[in-house]
């Protein structure tokens, strides 16, 4: 695929590049350069991600970097490529997919750098290879928000806009997000080679992932020297821990297809996601998900289903189905334990133990049922509860409920439980566990509308708050307030 940058001098931005994925062989990818994005301009930049890459702030502010991250000038040392994968989408085999609008530049400092929205690839299918400003801002902000929350995630270095028109449901404008992760390998990469009976390539891919990210699988005693069963177990455990974090913070991914599942247990592919406003366990955030397959409360089971698909893909290497089943069982152990631990921390129960388990579980189950019945704002409840000690007026928490008697009864039981914990310690734990700020849909929408008018101040403000969501940030309380009535009318779909 020919692009206009092929004869330009490559720019050196001071990063040492390699591309170990490119060494796997041509079966895994197509080499190609990103398409130029006309007249690009900065929309948002993460200095935190830049530091992770070893990229100086002077480069992050430079017009030269703007050009290389939008395909207008090649970057010295990179080996750009688009990878092929397959997968299950909404429960059905979708066949060959692949990086339809993302180009992997390579890796630097152990981190892969990928440009999303960088033009057509052989895997674009019916797409145009571009991403729009709207979805790019959402991905940029949510990547950094999840990092701030301590949830495993891909990162975003920057989002760059252009006035180039892009047609979706309406005509929008183009953008490119620079994404960063140790690897962007998905369950779907394994499914692709397994489905096509390319077992040699499947083994090459599995060995690459094990040697680079899971070397302990080579010495697994549990699976009698079978590193592929050990890999499945390790991925299952990481995925379980990740989904537990999602459920605890109230994050709904929206499109948990197998090609959107990271082999490293990272949150990737931010599309029609949402942080819950009112606590509705059955909430469906993706307007395209008509049957509610990816509802909030279904995420744990869907993740297991996706892991089962990964297990099937790895079966030619694992050999025995019993070993694969045993490896998957770890998910059923790790997820509930991790979720319970996180929820006890949200309650400030730092002394939770077997002796308190019955009381603690009842407290947790009862408050979740009450929150759901009353449709209480999930983030605000937990943050207010964090400020509600034994000797503190609980009125701000009571005000969230219509059924005050039910709230009072629960708060009494809760305060009695906290009497066994040194005063102040529970609140300290809770304030570090229950964020004040999350990326609510309406906040993202306000930033997007301002950015369309070339006002990027809302993007900058949200980035600042979301990078440290547990801090109070005096003067910014409006960003932690209840969503306005119009927020419920926002519809987010797979269109991006």
UniProtKB/Swiss-Prot annotation:
GO terms for molecular function: AMPylase activity; ATP binding; magnesium ion binding. It comes from Albidiferax ferrireducens (strain ATCC BAA-621 / DSM 15236 / T118) (Rhodoferax ferrireducens). ATP binds at residues 98, 100-101, 116, 128-129, 179, 186, 269. It comes from the Bacteria. Keywords: ATP-binding, Magnesium, Manganese, Metal-binding, Nucleotide-binding, Nucleotidyltransferase, Transferase. Its cofactor is Mg(2+); Mn(2+). This is Protein nucleotidyltransferase YdiU. HAMAP family: YdiU_SelO (MF_00692). The active site is at 259 (proton acceptor). Its EC number is 2.7.7.-, 2.7.7.108. Belongs to the SELO family. Pfam families: SelO. Nucleotidyltransferase involved in the post-translational modification of proteins. It can catalyze the addition of adenosine monophosphate (AMP) or uridine monophosphate (UMP) to a protein, resulting in modifications known as AMPylation and UMPylation. InterPro entries: SelO. It catalyses: L-seryl-[protein] + ATP = 3-O-(5'-adenylyl)-L-seryl-[protein] + diphosphate; L-threonyl-[protein] + ATP = 3-O-(5'-adenylyl)-L-threonyl-[protein] + diphosphate; L-tyrosyl-[protein] + ATP = O-(5'-adenylyl)-L-tyrosyl-[protein] + diphosphate; L-histidyl-[protein] + UTP = N(tele)-(5'-uridylyl)-L-histidyl-[protein] + diphosphate. It is an enzyme of class 2 (transferase). The lineage of its organism: Bacteria, Pseudomonadati, Pseudomonadota, Betaproteobacteria, Burkholderiales. Mg(2+) binds at residues 260, 269.
């Amino acid at each position: 695929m020919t692009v206009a940058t092929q004869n330009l001098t490559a720019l050196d931005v001071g990063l040492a590049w390699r591309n170990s994925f490119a060494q796997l062989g041509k079966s895994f990818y197509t080499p190609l350069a990103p398409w130029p994005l006309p007249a690009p301009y900065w929309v948002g930049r993460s200095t935190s991600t830049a530091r992770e890459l070893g990229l100086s702030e002077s480069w992050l502010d430079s017009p030269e970097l703007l050009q290389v991250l939008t395909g207008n000038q090649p970057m010295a040392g990179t080996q750009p490529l688009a990878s092929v994968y397959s997968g299950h989408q909404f429960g059905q085999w979708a066949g060959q997919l692949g990086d339809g609008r993302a180009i992997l530049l390579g890796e630097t400092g152990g981190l892969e750098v990928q440009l999303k929205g960088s033009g057509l690839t052989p895997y674009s299918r019916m797409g145009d290879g571009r991403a729009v400003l709207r979805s790019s801002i959402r991905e940029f902000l949510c990547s950094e928000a999840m990092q701030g929350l301590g949830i495993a995630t891909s990162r975003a270095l920057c989002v760059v806009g252009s006035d180039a028109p892009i047609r979706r449901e309406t005509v929008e404008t183009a953008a490119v997000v620079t994404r960063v992760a140790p690897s962007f390998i998905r369950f779907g990469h394994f499914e692709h080679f397994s489905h096509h009976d390319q077992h040699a390539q499947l083994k090459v891919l599995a060995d690459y992932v094990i040697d680079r990210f899971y070397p302990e699988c080579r010495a697994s005693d549990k699976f009698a020297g079978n590193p592929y069963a050990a890999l499945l177990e390790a991925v299952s455990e990481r995925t379980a821990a990740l989904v537990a974090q999602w459920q605890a913070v109230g994050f709904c991914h929206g499109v948990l297809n197998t090609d959107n599942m990271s082999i490293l247990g990272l949150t990737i592919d931010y599309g029609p996601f949402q942080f819950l406003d009112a606590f509705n366990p059955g909430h469906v955030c993706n307007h395209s998900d008509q049957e509610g397959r990816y509802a909030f409360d279904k995420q744990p089971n869907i993740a297991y289903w996706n892991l089962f698909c990964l297990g099937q893909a790895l079966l030619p290497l694992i050999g025995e189905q019993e070993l694969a089943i045993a490896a998957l069982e770890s998910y059923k152990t790790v997820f509930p334990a991790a979720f319970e631990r996180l929820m006890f921390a949200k309650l400030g129960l730092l002394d939770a133990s077997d002796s308190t388990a019955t009381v603690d579980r009842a407290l947790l189950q009862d408050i979740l049922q009450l929150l759901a019945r009353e449709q209480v704002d999930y983030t605000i409840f937990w943050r207010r509860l964090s400020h509600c000690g034994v000797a503190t007026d609980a009125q701000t928490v009571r005000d969230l409920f219509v059924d005050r008697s039910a709230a009072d009864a629960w708060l009494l039981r809760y305060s009695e439980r906290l009497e066994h914990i040194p005063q102040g310690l529970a609140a300290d734990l809770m304030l570090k566990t229950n964020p004040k700020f999350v990326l609510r849909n309406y906040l993202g929408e306000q930033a997007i509308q301002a950015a369309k008018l070339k006002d990027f101040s809302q993007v900058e403000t949200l980035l600042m708050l979301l990078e440290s969501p547990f801090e109070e940030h005096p003067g910014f309380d409006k960003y932690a307030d209840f969503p306005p009535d119009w927020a419920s009318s926002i519809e987010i779909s797979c269109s991006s």
